[in-house]
């Protein structure tokens, strides 16, 4: 079986639970070789974001050229892009290098509520990046921002917004329903072939730092092994649930701790 080379394009997390660090752990845990392009240096920990240093867009583009000119990239995850010019740089390089199997985690806010994408960049992301990617993974506030619409409060409103996002041109949409006030956490997958509901009981832990990053990285790592997004989502969600179930065994930070990416090993 051909080895999988996976790329993450995202910001950093020195505490190791989110961003590039979480993505590379996820790739390794799921048997993919990880490459990375850094868009922002983020001073953050389990308690919140303290500072963000955005990388110059030309240097983001240079990193992408370095990877794509040398390494066969089978799958890509995009996370924090921070600002308009970085979104433009990434969109242009994806087009230039004919990149496939791209999962876009529409990162706008950290778990702590701190902003990770400038408001002006949302339109650029919507117009330049969405039509190029294979799958987007918005939560309900992110979906509302992309659609310039009110936050979905019911599963029916969530369905309507997922269909509207799919119409923007991406191959598939995974709407994450964690913000709904239900005992279970329903997610909906929208593709050109149809719609599929995924639901599981909420894991009883406060340690959920980096779950969005981790899920999108898992989806990217697993996609080349499956025939459909439905199969990919099913395995990625099962793996993430196990990582969440073991999160309390870690002793990381004073705030919202990370999931246990290597729960299968230690």
Curated annotation (Swiss-Prot):
Q: What class of enzyme is it?
A: transferase
Q: In its keyword annotation, does this UniProt entry include Kinase?
A: yes
Which CDD domains does this chain map to?
HMPP_kinase
Q: Supply the source organism for this entry.
A: Salmonella typhimurium (strain LT2 / SGSC1412 / ATCC 700720)
BP GO annotations: thiamine biosynthetic process; thiamine diphosphate biosynthetic process
What positions does the entry give for 4-amino-5-hydroxymethyl-2-methylpyrimidine binding? Answer: 44
Belongs to which family? Answer: Belongs to the ThiD family.
Q: Name one GO molecular function term.
A: ATP binding
Ordered alphabetically, the record's keywords are: ATP-binding, Kinase, Nucleotide-binding, Thiamine biosynthesis, Transferase
InterPro entries according to UniProt: HMP/HMP-P_kinase_dom, PM/HMP-P_kinase-1, Ribokinase-like
Q: Name one GO cellular component term.
A: cytosol
Q: Which Pfam families match?
A: Phos_pyr_kin
This chain's protein is named Hydroxymethylpyrimidine/phosphomethylpyrimidine kinase
């Amino acid at each position: 079986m051909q080895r999988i080379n996976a790329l993450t394009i995202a910001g950093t997390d020195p505490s190791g639970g989110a961003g590039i660090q979480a993505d590379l752990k996820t790739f390794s845990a799921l048997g993919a070789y990880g490459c990375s392009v850094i868009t922002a240096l983020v001073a953050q920990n389990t308690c919140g974001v303290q500072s963000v240093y955005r990388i110059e867009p030309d240097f983001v583009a240079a990193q992408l050229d370095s990877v794509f000119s040398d390494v066969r990239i089978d799958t890509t995850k995009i996370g924090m892009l921070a600002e308009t010019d970085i979104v433009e740089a990434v969109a242009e390089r994806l087009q230039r290098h004919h990149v496939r199997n791209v999962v876009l985690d529409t990162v706008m806010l950290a778990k702590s509520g701190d902003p990770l994408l400038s408001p002006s960049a949302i339109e650029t992301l919507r117009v330049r990046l969405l039509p190029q990617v294979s799958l987007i993974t918005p939560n309900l506030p992110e979906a509302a921002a992309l659609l310039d619409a009110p936050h979905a409060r019911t599963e029916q409103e969530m369905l309507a917004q997922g269909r509207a996002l799919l119409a923007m041109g991406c191959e598939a949409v995974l709407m994450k329903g964690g913000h709904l006030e239900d005992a279970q956490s329903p997610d909906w997958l929208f593709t050109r072939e149809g719609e599929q509901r995924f639901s599981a009981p909420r894991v009883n832990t406060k340690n959920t730092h980096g779950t969005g990053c981790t899920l999108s990285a898992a989806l990217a790592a697993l996609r080349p092994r499956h025939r459909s997004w439905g199969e990919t989502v099913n395995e990625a969600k099962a793996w993430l649930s196990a990582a969440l179930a073991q999160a309390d065994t870690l002793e990381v930070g004073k705030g919202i701790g990370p999931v246990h990416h290597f729960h299968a090993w230690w």
